[in-house]
């Protein structure tokens, strides 16, 4: 404790010594004469008796203080020094020393805010410093004193007790400092610089305390005046001094200087130096105050009104330096106070930044404005907030869209080298694009972390308006999701309103109908809706608005009243309000219309006036009419004698309820109209920010929703980018084209990828446009260059290779969002192949054709989020960095790399193969577009082939890619292949379509797809049907196809029949396979393979045949056995297999019969069971139909030239009838029908053939061969007849049938063989008749009956056929 006490005592002694030193210094300077004649002894005594005595008294107390210095009233040791400063008899040098003494006292902080008397002491210091008096001296000494004053002022504000200063004292300090700045003008740069620095420091100190000022609970109303009373006066300075100082700083923006122009007259212009100084101080105040300004209404209103008005007024016409400072100030306001500055910020962009950037006169100013725009774009939330608050509000300008288009417009290169402003604009555009892309990716990342099925998934459909929602009413942000939908609808309304304005300007009726059709106005019509349309929609014809509002119809009058209610005239003068009203339309020429419109205005203006100057609205009405007439009088060149002010006042006497209006008021109105005419333009156009419009804007702030602070939403991001997508792509493409700098090219590609990152969320047309734009830089699609020129450009210029890498990178990364762009990609791919820059290794795909990926595997892949996000960005751009690093030609040459190897390295980085091998993750629509492009390219659309070989190779290449896609997407074959099939049909109708290479190269691939589908054994049979449908149209396109491709077709068809017949389930599949097998079996080279395949099918895989496919199998088998040069052994095998196939018919018949029997059960007595019964009956009939088809095949085969085959066909026919006798359930009529249509024609055809040979010369061998076959056929007839006899005898048609049998016996018996001798059938027929009639007698079918003439007919026919048999067959019987 003793050591602490000693240390404190030493500190107190040090303070005493310091004070003693300062007193001595001041006294020494006072006593020192400046010159021998300067001071007389009397004057020295006078100084000693007043100021010196005070200093001496202080010295007497210094070393004997009664208490600690921190507890002593500071005025005790400050007042002597202040007396020196305030004395006008003290030399300037002594004043300077006294100021230094006070500064030292403040710096070592002898007292603090808790010291008794500290507040009075601080205020006395301020009072003493600001009332400092100097005797006349030289300028250098005065400057030295002023420098000391500035230091002391700063010391005062930095002292801990400064918070005890009164508001007036703080304002005095600032004012004193500014006076020093002003007085230093022209006296020296050093003093002025120090003065400005001090002022800046004071502002920083004062406004840094603003966030700590307490806000009273009753503060916050728009008209609250609590700003000036919220801090207790005993607590030191507060918001009141901040308001006064800020007001003072704003007023500095209006400081003018008088300059002489070229004409020799003096004009007043803004003092730029003072403006810059003021802007620096205002910037500091806003930066340090932050959002605390928003807690103090009066200060906030000053920023909203005074400051913003000044900044906008001077911004558009200032120098680059001033504009730069203004932009910085506005950016700070945006950062801290944008919630309160919605309309003000819009006005700044509209009247300053966008206007200056559009003006092409002064490039430095334009560059500063552009930099201001870019600085805003650098703010993380600016672009989305600008879009939400302005672009989505029908009453505001499209700030975001216009900003983006301004950057695009300035990015576009000209014919010369790139300028600084173009580079700057490009950087801004890239920032904007990256901002949108990063935010959309960031939201996706956050959404995936929270929930894989988050609610913000992008829907590709645009916003549609389905109901009437008042477009002029904004909705506060409560629920974010609902609010996002609301602003998207408002943006859609805004677009529709622009279209409606266009319609309205051309035809009023069509414009109003368009409004109703798009739910922009209600039905029945709401007058406010139409009034808001007239009031807030830009681009409307003002003449048409005036004509509509002036119409006397009741609806038009209602709209007029609503129209006037959209104006806020509170606080406006009459002339200002009338100007604002008349600027929104053009007054019609009819006086009655003008009358109605002025009446509506007068009523609205009168209702919103707080003053008592007008007795009634009639007064306003009369005065408005008078002002309009005055405007015409003063500004119409045809009026020679102008009305004077006195005449105007005299004309308006006694209009205020019989009394006169104040003469001063009328005089002000007259001067306003005389000097500034009403703006009565016809069309909407650019306007200036004048005081009238500013008042209107401030009135609108009372009813407008505050600036919405919102987070990024991917739906909003997609919509906002769509507004600038076209210009952005064009600008980036043009910049890429005109730039040769590697870094700039890299930035262009980076921007292109970011555009694609945004476009993948439902903006597919934009991505297609991007790809088409960059494909032209590859030089691969230039139709006017030769392959050699293209190859040279590709090999020696980095830009084409970089563009190629970019295009295929987009295809790999964003292929799921590409639509029409696939055509350009395919064209580039084909050109690379034509240039031999595409080695086979690049496009070798590993696709398992036999098994492929399962559907569950594909679902796992597709369930993953395939969207590109920023986590992929580093690797993607890393590829381009690697590309740029390897693109050094000299380095490549040093490494021994040829041009081909360099190009190959680029192509390998393109990963072209993955586009197709990984197409399973592409969405359906992307697969459709990619396939369409490839099919059309394979058909030759857009291609020019120099040789047939080139055409064949190109077609094969395209088909390889098509098949790769199909093989990779078998799991969703039903989705995309129907469209592919339509594309195949379409290309067949192309004018220059060449079917041979197209089908020849396509068929093998289609068979590969077919085999994979069959190998997959899918539950759904539609893929099988689809692929066979395409195969069918392919080989039917041209009759030469089979001749060209028979070997390939045979190979694949045989494989399908042998290995995958169990998986063939469709009718068209079996039909196609067996038809192709039949056609290919006609060729000697493939005949044996085709026949073996059929025999294998019928021998080992016949169980896989269905009733439908059985018919095609029989047709195919018949086609083989009917061939003349086919193997007899194999044909006989086929005939045996055909006969044995009756067992399959029996099986199907029994199944159908069983089902039919079950359908008759009592429980099935419903309509559904009846339908089932009908189906089963159709099944039975179909089996009988198949039996007939089989028999018909045998019948046709009986006419074959080779005897072995004919005879086997006849016996097979008998075998089939015999096997189906009992098990196929033929009815009597059915049996007769089969024999009548198969066996009878067989005998007839053989008999006719026999007679034909008998008439030919040297044809005895053939005739005898045919005769032998006919014998067998006759025996078959007898055997079949006897087998089916008991069934057919029950038929009513048996008599006719029996006559048919006898007729054929007679025909064969009497066949005349001519010169070749006897007919050996005469030996067979009697035997056959004997057997048949004998059997019929045994079964008592052929007996004499009174009511049956069968016996009689037979008896008579036998006498004609073989009379010798009559006695044998009918020994005891006679007619």
Swiss-Prot record:
Q: In which tissues is it expressed?
A: Preferentially expressed in mature pollen grains and growing pollen tubes.
Q: Name one GO cellular component term.
A: cytosol
This one is known as ARF guanine-nucleotide exchange factor GNL2
Q: Which organism is it from?
A: Arabidopsis thaliana (Mouse-ear cress)
Q: What does this protein do?
A: Activates the ARF proteins by exchanging bound GDP for free GTP. Plays a role in vesicular protein sorting. Essential for pollen germination.
Active-site residues, as the UniProt record annotates them: 590
What is a GO molecular function of this protein? guanyl-nucleotide exchange factor activity
Which Gene3D superfamilies has this protein been placed in? 1.10.220.20, Arf Nucleotide-binding Site Opener,domain 2
* Loss of function: phenotype: Failure of pollen germination.
Subunit: Homodimer.
Q: What is its main location?
A: cytoplasm
